[in-house]
Amino acid sequence: MQPDAVSYQGEVVTRRRAGAAQRRPQRRSAVIVASSLLAGLVTAIALVVGPFAGGRESVITGAILLGFAVGWALLAVLSVRLTDRPQRWAAVPAAAMAIAGAGLMVLAPGVAVLTALGWVWPPLLLALVVWMIVHARRRQSSRVQPWLLYPVFGVLALAAVGGGYETLRNATDPALAQVAGTRLVDVGGHRLSIRCTGSGSPTVVLEPGLGESAAAMARWIAPDVARTTTVCAYDRAGHGRSDAVPANGYDAARDLHVLLKRAHVPGPYVIAGHSLGGMFALSYAHRYPAQVAGVVLLDSMHPHQDNAFAGPARLLAVIPTLARIGLARVFSDPKDGKPTTQAAQFVRDVNEMPAQLNRAANLTSLGDRPLSVVTAGTDSPAGWTAEQNDLATLSSITVHHTVADATHTSLIEDKRHAAQSSQAISDIVRAVRRRSG
């Protein structure tokens, strides 16, 4: 073999070895980026479903941020120790998210403060994302890294934009303006929202269902019933425009009692509850029997029903955080109000449900006080019809009506079906009037 050929072959082998040696740290760098980001995601999920499951929105959000901070910190540390292209810039998002997360968990701000912070964190997060992109581009060690990092940057940017839009929409949407005649009444440390229309006695009090606010009952039912008597739609604590209070040990019956007294709403009352609201109606009737002249249960839950949310209830606490970045708006009806508020209401009701079902179970009979049970005829879960039949036995004066083509929600949301709910309420009002002479 000629010397030139041997020299050429040696040069080729040397280049191949050099290329392979160069690709090894590049592959290692890509693995570190991917594994660090994945570790951050896994840590966030573990914190949310583990030690902080079922926590308040501020705690859940803080746990997620701490998990993400772990991922960015790993990227900064491992890239410095194990690669020739250290990603020291990752220490900045790690520190920012760790500080924000720890602050949320320690201070545990309420919904009002989190809403106010909605004007602050989206632009800060967007600025951080831009800064991260600029510095990450300078430290790229392979063509693989951009495909690993840029989707993460994109998700963070979308969260910032979504959070900003959600805050702006909640503050400016004319459809969410306060309805004339709505009052905020102090019931002892917090205020409840109530709006009464119509005239006459007995007064009808509308109890919204699971995750619902007074607006749901006031859309079709309240105006119809107002033609017959006085009707009041109110928001329980933490719902609609009412102030939030800790869910643990919350006494809804006491709140309503004080609200009606301080708002100068005269009794006796016909309490009409939809879904979970039916359980609040029964609890109130048990606690203040002399004030309740009649009850209407609109496809109500049953005190002894299986709690379908018992298993995932603690995991549902992540919903308000997702709503805060605009995800709930994608799946919600714009007419129903603020998705962020709805999400918090839903989680609060789910957490309160076991205690509320137990309180409702204390009422074993309404005696001869008129009762109307309205049942949706479609899309009901197994055993629902039997539970509705059992509710109808609570009074010796009962009307049980099934709306064949109605669903659980259409009894209050569909105009035609809501009219039948309104009719059932008005019928009980007339029955009470006949009894009182």
Model regions: which residues?
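Internal/C-terminal transmembrane anchor helices
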Residues: 142-169
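Conserved serine/cysteine hydrolase catalytic core
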Residues: 334-403, 425
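Membrane-embedded alpha-helical segments of integral membrane proteins
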Residues: 89-137
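Flexible "cap/lid" loop of the alpha/beta hydrolase fold
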Residues: 296-325
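Active-site loop/oxyanion-hole signature of alpha/beta-hydrolase fold enzymes
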Residues: 236-270
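Conserved HGGG/HGGXW glycine-rich cap/lid loop of the alpha/beta-hydrolase fold
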Residues: 197-241
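Catalytic active-site module of serine/aspartate enzymes centered on a nucleophile-bearing elbow/loop
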Residues: 6-28, 396-437
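Conserved hydrolase catalytic core segment
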Residues: 266-306
